[in-house]
């Protein structure tokens, strides 16, 4: 986001007026803005750390990343420090190795889930 981008700009002495996450991602993926690439790389690393913490807190077997801008840069995420940071939990790294990580790319997962739940409920009602 803009705060992370501002921190990278300050650290590198660069400044470009990119404030929207979508603009930062576009500039990073197009490769013409080094600070945008560094910002996106930092975002992926932080996301990996947070996702690893959440997986441990909840005893997850799968981590689902949904919504936002992540579906736009899955290849970048795969080549980033995301997984390294996800696993960097000391003695818990072995457990996290077995945790599946998925990015939901469907544009309406909430509606899809609601439709599936409704279908299941209707099937149960019909079976009675």
Q: What does each model-found stretch correspond to?
A:
Residues 1-128:
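ATP-binding/phosphotransfer module of carbohydrate and carboxylate kinases, centering on a glycine-rich
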